[in-house]
């Protein structure tokens, strides 16, 4: 579904990605983790061409993302992305935020778009908030609207860039539940997150990045219990203690 071949990206003199290669199969859930500045978010942004790579190529479902001739509207309809900031239009209701792109970009009739949007709001558990504005919604509700908005374009791939990092702790689980449901329905997903419980329970594979490269990857059980690389073990030791202060064992995440 996704083939990333030796891509590199710099911002000025700062090398953010260095010859990164990664394949993601259809229906697979891959979690990217690593310290801040390791290139995780930039990698996501390259997958749907929010950032252009300097070398290498990316192919998603047969579409070469790195081809400058690619139709970006068509590409981004196939690759949904959800950010840590919700990016909802404040002057539009939840329903209107979801229907805007299908109506404007793909020409979906408004009534059909509204019916589909209501079904998506039901799916993410907030159908009763359809006519509310973002300012009237909690952070968790806004993020669920953002997920529904991305799903309205019927993407084949969903990218999540730290979707819970801006949320209060009590709102995190409601968003993770929606993401877990998507994974179980077979959605291909690449997720940047520090929620290691989600990673262990939902991911098919975990990829650890540092310094713009992939340091290590593996299935969750192996990754948490017997990480090979010292940098990986150091990162896991810190993040698992942060998430579970009563335990320091790498295999302790529930």
Whereabouts are the PLM-identified features?
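ABC family nucleotide-binding domain
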Residues: 1-220
């Amino acid at each position: 579904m996704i083939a990333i071949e030796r891509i590199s990206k710099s911002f000025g003199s700062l090398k953010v990605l260095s010859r990164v290669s990664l394949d993601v199969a259809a229906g697979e859930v891959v979690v990217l983790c690593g310290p801040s500045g390791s290139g995780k978010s930039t990698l996501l942004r390259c997958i749907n061409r929010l950032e252009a790579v300097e070398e290498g190529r990316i192919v998603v479902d047969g579409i070469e993302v790195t081809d400058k001739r690619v139709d970006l509207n068509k590409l981004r309809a196939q690759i949904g992305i959800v950010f840590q900031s919700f990016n909802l239009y404040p002057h539009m209701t939840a329903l209107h935020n979801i229907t805007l792109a299908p109506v404007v970009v793909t020409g979906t009739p408004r009534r059909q778009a509204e019916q589909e949007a209501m079904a998506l709001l039901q799916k993410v558990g907030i159908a009763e908030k359809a006519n509310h504005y973002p300012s009237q919604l909690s952070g968790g509700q806004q993020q669920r609207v953002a997920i529904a908005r991305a799903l309205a374009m019927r993407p084949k791939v969903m990218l999540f860039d730290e979707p819970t990092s801006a949320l209060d702790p009590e709102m995190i689980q409601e968003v993770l539940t929606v993401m877990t449901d998507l994974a179980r329905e077979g959605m291909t997903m690449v997720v940047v997150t520090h929620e290691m419980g989600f990673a262990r329970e939902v991911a098919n594979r975990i990829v650890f990045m540092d310094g713009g490269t992939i340091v290590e990857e593996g299935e969750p059980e192996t990754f948490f219990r017997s990480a090979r690389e010292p940098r990986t073990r150091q990162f896991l030791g810190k993040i698992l203690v942060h998430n579970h202060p009563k335990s320091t064992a790498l295999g302790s995440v529930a």
